[in-house]
Amino acid sequence: IFAATGGAESGATTSTANITFDDVLELFYSLRSPYRKKAVWVLNDSTVKALRKLKDSTGNYIWNPSVQAGVPDTILNRPYYTSSYVPEIKAGAKCLAFGDFSYYWIGDRQGRSFKRLNEVFAMNGQVGFLASQRVDGRLILTEAVKTLGMKA
């Protein structure tokens, strides 16, 4: 999704280092309405921090945390998830994704295989194991997820 090719469709900010509330709104409404029904935000913790600092023209914070126990915070009334694999805010990086991730499919290409390695660790009285599995993921419908890229 955050790759340069084969990922989600991307929009760009007007800044190389900051996200504005207008950028977030543009990303939200760039996603077609059928996908917004199940859409979620995916971003890095540092991006959450930057979004929480955004203020409107009167100086009020735009972020409204949940006031009910057990109800998560939202961005524009849509839930968000943080991931350390999402790039941080920097020039040229895609730092925010919004969309219906049910169109991101994960495929197991072969079953798991386990191999017992008796000889390798025999001198230490140990037994080793080697496990492998081939897995891949792909965004099947690119219009279902949009990303926000920082200006290069």
Pin down the residues of each PLM region.
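Structured, hydrophobic secondary-structure cores that serve as assembly/anchoring elements
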Residues: 1-152
